[in-house]
């Protein structure tokens, strides 16, 4: 489970603090809005993995861990990503 915990305010052990670096406690690169946005905009087809650290599986995993706020979980990666745009729109409507 640790592999899917990124710098979103909580780490794999449940600490309520932001990571001090762009990496999570496992040393994996966290979701980055600039990186993700760039990759998403370059994607030829909707539904492709957002990046090597941001696949559909990881998005589902993060949603299950933090079901209350999908936009917070996915940080800045949602707005320009076809794969997750519908989920984000639904969440915003229900705010």
UniProtKB/Swiss-Prot annotation:
Signal sequence annotation: none
InterPro entries: PLipase_A2_inh_N
Superkingdom in the source lineage: Eukaryota
Subcellular location: Secreted
Nuclease among keywords: no
UniProt keyword Mitochondrion, yes or no: no
Residue stretches in coiled coil: none
GO molecular function annotation: phospholipase A2 inhibitor activity
Tissue: Expressed by the liver.
Cysteines engaged in disulfide bonds, as pairs: 2-26, 5-12, 19-30, 61-77
A GO cellular component entry from the record: extracellular region
Alphabetized UniProt keyword annotations: Disulfide bond, Phospholipase A2 inhibitor, Secreted
Subunit: Forms dimers or higher order oligomers in a temperature-dependent manner in vitro.
Protein family: Belongs to the CNF-like-inhibitor family.
Function: Inhibits the enzymatic activity of basic and acidic PLA2 from B.jararacussu and B.pauloensis, respectively, in a dose-dependent manner. Also inhibits myotoxicity and cytotoxicity of BnSp-7 of B.pauloensis.
Protein name: Phospholipase A2 inhibitor gammaCdcPLI
Source organism of the structure: Crotalus durissus collilineatus (Brazilian rattlesnake)
